[in-house]
């Protein structure tokens, strides 16, 4: 471009020509001017070309600049990494890092953030770097950087002031002191070899305000750079200005401080000259000191009182919590923590301790109490969980307090009296235990050291005149009558108010001998036994019953029972086969044995039960039946080959007995034999109905019956209500009316993605912003604890089989929100700004719509839930684990397995938790009432008859 042209002609003509045109900052020759105007009017520009306007007044870096800078930085970083890697892998040993040519100290910020050019995000402290006015800044932050500005000048000033101080104390006038100080300081000229600049020259701008503070190298550098090299005239001016601002600010403060000090020193010197004033001043000082001390002691005492009160409150809270736990697990009187009691008694005397000691002691106690409180809270949580889970196991009136077992020790006098009497008949002996186990052969194994406190009451001596409540057999009357008639008839004594004192004392001793023991009465091993580990119930050895005394069936004894049953059934089966084979021979026997009706069969089985419970011998039930019904089996019992060995006798007698036991109707269905309809109204068939009358415990397809399992109903069928009612499915949970109105073919997936997502998204985003501190660095699983997204139960209770779809979806989107806020917004441990909150809200809503909304391609969560539904329907846990073993077996063996399976199902039904608990509850209630009542009656009778 040539020189700026001077317009030929007058100014008026130029104005007339250029009046309408926009003014140009630079006057151009005509050939350049046209080109510029074309660009300005965006004529014949290339496609990607942009007109570039640069304003020198306020230059702003564009995005391209930043990108270029960023790229450059990345290249340098890469090169540095390469160098460092090469150095690391090289064989030569490393020199000291400072002298190492590859050593690059780490910058303070590890992450490069592209600078934002908006005014809003400017830091409030940016005014420190660039002074906005010529005034000195009001507050100067005390940073390590500001230490760099202290230099020889301020040091000199301080030295001069201290010198003046000394001179004035020694009695010079201020003027003299000043003169002398100036003179002395000008004489002291320190030799300065290193500093090469004049005193007005400030240090270079780089050391003044470094952009990125570098970590200083640990070793001293060999070469010292001359700092003048990089300074320019402008640098010097700016730095001088800054230093003047700093110094003027500091000097003002310093001078004021020094002047006040000098003033007080002058006053002090004057006071020293006149002793009366000095005395007064001293007196005043002492008074002020005394007042100050008094106030300090008072404030300290107030603080001590507050701390002591807080300690007392904490101890009180702790005691309350411990009392609550104690009441839940025990009925013993509560005695608090003895250490806390001692502390409460002695804590008021701590006021006398010096403050530091007091502080240490109370802090220790606070820590200790906090620790105890934490332990107590954990303990309480465990107890509460235990009680919440054991609702069904609680005894009387289903209160949450553990029930109380009655233990009755009969008085010593009664024992002496009854021991002299004759032993009771064997039929009465059964009252010694509270519950008889169903089968005498199965000895229970003890699986755990935990015991329960049902006391075995041996009341056989006391109950001679009464029937026991837990008897299963009608009492044999004759021997009892004989004994009663043998006793001398005592005249009945009436109880009256005028009874002698001895009677009352007897009553007292009798009542004292009834002691209550707080023990849980559960007869079933709990599913949540781990929660009980830290709760110890008070018990001693003699008060507890071993596991074998309870009616519960652990796995070992269940196996043994099933083995016994299968053995027994095998025998029955063999007998049936042999009987069919010998039908022709046994016709004569059938004539001898009367045809047994159903009634007689039931009485037989009753007798069998009686005999089993009465005799604890190891005889088999068949032998016992034979010995009971001697007349029935007399024909077969006189066998010529009979030997003296018992087991051989049993073998000979078995064929006839089996004929008696098996009922012809029952032979068809073996399962009926094991269901006890008297004990539990619910029969086995009813219990298994939901599985579609399929009795087998597996799906192996050749065992009991292979009727296909009913189709699982799902909410994804999308059938209209008419078609749905026509389809053959399980009974739907929702009634038909509700189905047509509320639930007309609603697809849960569609509902979640369309309606529910719209409603819940803003709520979730707000929650994430509110709880940002708790959500920082949290994964999706823990995020459910910070805020629980709504579950299906909260929203609607009617269709409870849809909850998996709904719940998994709400958890999914909440997790997505948490992940997003953690990934992009919660950085560096600071709170989000308003702008960031707005940005996050928009981004999160958009993300939820695109990724989880109706048009999103991702619906894996749905297929997952469907899959788990399917698996649940298949019941893979119930597939029989012996299936593979059994595949290659012959039919007879398969039949054997089928029998075993029947037994297993029956045992499971018979010894189900629920049944056992109900049974134990009933027995407990009746036993408690009847036994207590009878014992009291017999004791009162005995006491009265003695008198």
Curated annotation (Swiss-Prot):
Keyword list, A-Z: Cell cycle, Coiled coil, Cytoplasm, Cytoskeleton
Positions with biased composition (Basic and acidic residues): 30-50, 62-84, 645-657
Region (Disordered): 20-148, 173-211, 407-453, 575-594, 600-662, 681-705
Biased segments, Polar residues type: 90-102, 179-188, 430-449
Major subcellular location class: cytoplasm
GO biological process, one term: mitotic spindle organization
A single GO cellular-component term on record: centrosome
Bias type Acidic residues, positions: 580-590
Signal peptide: none
GO MF annotation, one: protein-macromolecule adaptor activity
Entry protein name: Regulator of spindle assembly protein 2
Protein's organism: Caenorhabditis elegans
